[in-house]
Each structure stands twice: as C-alpha cells, then as structure tokens.
Amino acid sequence: MKLISNILYVIIFTLIIVLTLVVISTRSSGGEPAVFGYTLKSVLSGSMEPEFNTGSLILVKEITDVKELQKGDVITFMQDANTAVTHRIVDITKQGDHLLFKTKGDNNAAADSAPVSDENVRAQYTGFQLPYAGYMLHFASQPIGTAVLLIVPGVMLLVYAFVTISSAIREIERKTKALETDTKDSTMST
C-alpha cells in the first residue's frame, strides 16, 4: 500500500509540475510554448491533411538561415501581423537580395495566392506531431483552461493528502488500541 501511495504521489506531483510549466510557457509566449528554438503550434485548419490533422500539435524549429530551405519543406510563416500559417514550399524564386517562397497546403487545390518573403518565414516543421493535443494547448491558453489545469491537479493533491493523513491517523489509532489491549492483558495476567 505504501509503494502504491508513493507512486500515486509522484504521478500527481509530476502532473502538477508539467501542467504548471505548460500553462506558464503558454501564457508567456502568447499561447505557444517555446524551448531552445522549438515551438509547439496548434493546427487550426485541415489545409495540411494528411501530413497533420486539425487539432494536432506540431513541433517547429526556428529558422536561422532561410537559404537552407528547399522545395518540399514545410514552413511556418506570418501571413499578416497576427496570422501564422504552416504550408509546404512548392517553389522558390529570388528577387534581389530576398527569397520568395510559393507555398501550398497539401489539402488545398491551389497554391497560396501571395508568395512568402524570406522575412516572414519563422520556423520549419520538424516532422514531430501529437494528434489532437493542439486542442489541449488551445484550451490551456484560455483563462478557463489555465484555471482548470492548475486547480484540478491541486485539488487532486489535496484529496490525496487528506486520504494519506486519514489513513495514517487510523493506523496510529489501531496501533494505540492494540498497545492498550496488550497492556491490559499483561496487567491482568500479573
């Protein structure tokens, strides 16, 4: 019982730490956790199916040199000031000192209407994805999601602590009763 109790404690405590880090990272990065140049992005549309589905969480790496990008690479770029898009490069052209990337969602019939300037490219898809985990990240970035992801594990830890303390008190009472019974029995026999 003690081993199960300790394992349960470690699992709940680890869950609280992980969820707290996800929430903090999500809040501080504007909704997308980033570590060492890698960012988790939620897939909001089906434009890249079957490569990754709506609701998936994909891992992208910050671009350090756009000249290394090739036709067929999947990139994340800023379509406008507030909209990040992840599509595949279908063509690359040079215009003066800049590269222009023609992109297309795998599930779209036609390429994107405007080419993407190298200045707007932010990251490259690493090939790693977690299906449906993007829904969780989106939930965590909302105020109610933040509250739930911090409060629920906290309540679980409090319930666990209450059960553990209650169990310890019952064990102490049982041992005290047994000791009193042994003391009475030994007093009566003398």
From Swiss-Prot:
Keywords: Cell membrane, Hydrolase, Membrane, Protease, Transmembrane, Transmembrane helix
InterPro entries xref list: LexA/Signal_pep-like_sf, Peptidase_S26, Peptidase_S26B
Function comment: Required for the cleavage of the signal sequence of TasA and TapA, which are involved in biofilm formation.
Topology relative to the membrane: Multi-pass membrane protein
Record's keyword annotation contains Protease: yes
GO CC terms: plasma membrane
Biological process per Gene Ontology, one example term: signal peptide processing
Induction (free text): Part of the tapA-sipW-tasA operon. Expression is directly repressed by the DNA-binding protein master regulator of biofilm formation SinR and activated by the extracellular matrix regulatory protein RemA. Expressed constitutively at a low level. Also positively regulated by the sporulation transcription factors sigma H and Spo0A and repressed by the transition phase regulatory protein AbrB, probably indirectly.
Main location: membrane
Main EC class the enzyme belongs to: hydrolase
Gene3D superfamilies the UniProt entry points to: Umud Fragment, subunit A (2.10.109.10)
Gene that specifies this protein: sipW
Additional information: B.subtilis contains five chromosomal type I signal peptidases: SipS, SipT, SipU, SipV and SipW. They have different, but overlapping, substrate specificities and have different transcription patterns.
Substrates-to-products reaction catalysed: Cleavage of hydrophobic, N-terminal signal or leader sequences from secreted and periplasmic proteins
Consequences of knocking out this gene: Mutation impairs colony surface architecture.
GO terms, molecular function: serine-type endopeptidase activity
Classification of source organism: Bacteria, Bacillati, Bacillota, Bacilli, Bacillales
Transmembrane segments: 4-24, 143-163
Family statement: Belongs to the peptidase S26B family.
Protein name as annotated: Signal peptidase I W
Subcellular location: Cell membrane
Catalytic machinery residues: S45
Entry's EC annotation: 3.4.21.89
